[in-house]
């Protein structure tokens, strides 16, 4: 028997987690919570509007740890990070809620969203409609669907549930086959290309550039992972990509918002130096 990959382990645990949560809070209870949650802030619209101006539309990630890197940020205060990102020019936030592998929390999402006016995506491994309704109940504005973690039927089902509760969907692909499946199955305008190879964990920005010609112009391409310096940003912008999801680069900086501004808006100077993280 082959050894399970990290993704397979995560998905197996996620199925158990959903069962545990459903035993504590019924779907009907969650649906009632979702109906009275704060109105969605328009995750997709915010990104599209910024990218149309040919300005960086940055999804800034609130992430404490990862399976491959361990703890990335020791002093981790979601409210302060969110405020810092907002001052630095982020368009949206991404908050990790996976507990077992990323040391995330539902509470982190609620804290980050309450501290700013930015739309927020729940970054987790979505495998069940329960999690989608739960995301809206928590106040999320968007959910992530990872093609490598889902078959086409499940992907379509989760997207339909997201639409029914007012959530936007960001679909994440790693290669051409996954891109083809995503475009065939979903009509979401947000297509994220992860530059990290799931098998080797190596990162190459060429992944986004290679897939770019195959993505229809009515979809917004978001490059994920591997943006570490101005040259990376400029390479993407020259290629027509203005949307970015960045986590680790910001999380390792003393002031995440200042690092965001330095990387994406250097012409603005040091306006965020007075943030709560100085």
Curated annotation (Swiss-Prot):
EC number: 4.1.1.48
Keywords, sorted A to Z: Amino-acid biosynthesis, Aromatic amino acid biosynthesis, Decarboxylase, Lyase, Tryptophan biosynthesis
Catalytic activity: 1-(2-carboxyphenylamino)-1-deoxy-D-ribulose 5-phosphate + H(+) = (1S,2R)-1-C-(indol-3-yl)glycerol 3-phosphate + CO2 + H2O
Domain of life the protein comes from: Bacteria
Keyword Lyase: yes
Pathway where this protein functions: Amino-acid biosynthesis; L-tryptophan biosynthesis; L-tryptophan from chorismate: step 4/5
UniProt-listed Pfam families: IGPS
UniProt xrefs under CDD domains: IGPS
Biological process (GO), any one: L-tryptophan biosynthetic process
MF-aspect GO terms: indole-3-glycerol-phosphate synthase activity; phosphoribosylanthranilate isomerase activity
Assigned protein family: Belongs to the TrpC family.
Name used for this protein in its record: Indole-3-glycerol phosphate synthase
Organism: Pseudomonas fluorescens (strain SBW25)
């Amino acid at each position: 028997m082959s050894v399970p990959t990290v993704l397979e382990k995560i998905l197996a645990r996620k199925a158990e987690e959903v069962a545990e949560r459903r035993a504590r809070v019924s779907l009907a209870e969650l649906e009632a919570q979702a109906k009275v949650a704060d109105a969605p802030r328009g995750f997709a619209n915010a990104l599209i509007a910024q990218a149309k101006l040919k300005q960086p539309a940055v999804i800034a990630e609130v992430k404490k740890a990862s399976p491959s890197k361990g703890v990335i940020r020791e002093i981790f205060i979601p409210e302060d990070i969110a405020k810092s990102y907002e001052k630095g020019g982020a368009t949206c936030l991404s908050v990790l809620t996976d507990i077992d592998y990323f040391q995330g929390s539902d509470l982190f999402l609620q804290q980050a969203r309450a501290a700013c006016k930015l739309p927020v995506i729940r970054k987790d491994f979505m495998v069940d409609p329960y999690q989608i309704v739960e995301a809206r109940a928590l106040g999320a504005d968007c959910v992530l669907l990872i093609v490598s973690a889902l078959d086409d039927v499940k992907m379509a089902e989760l997207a339909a549930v997201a639409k029914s509760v007012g959530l936007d969907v960001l679909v994440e692909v790693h290669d051409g086959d996954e891109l083809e499946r995503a475009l065939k199955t979903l009509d979401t305008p947000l297509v994220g290309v992860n530059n990290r190879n799931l098998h080797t964990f190596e990162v190459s920005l060429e992944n986004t550039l290679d897939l770019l010609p195959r993505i229809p112009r009515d979809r917004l391409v978001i490059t994920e992972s591997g943006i570490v310096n101005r040259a990376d940003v400029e390479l993407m912008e020259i290629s027509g990509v203005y949307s970015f999801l960045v986590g680790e680069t910001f999380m390792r900086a003393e002031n995440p918002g200042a690092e965001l501004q330095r990387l994406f808006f250097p012409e603005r100077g040091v306006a965020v130096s007075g943030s709560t993280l100085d």
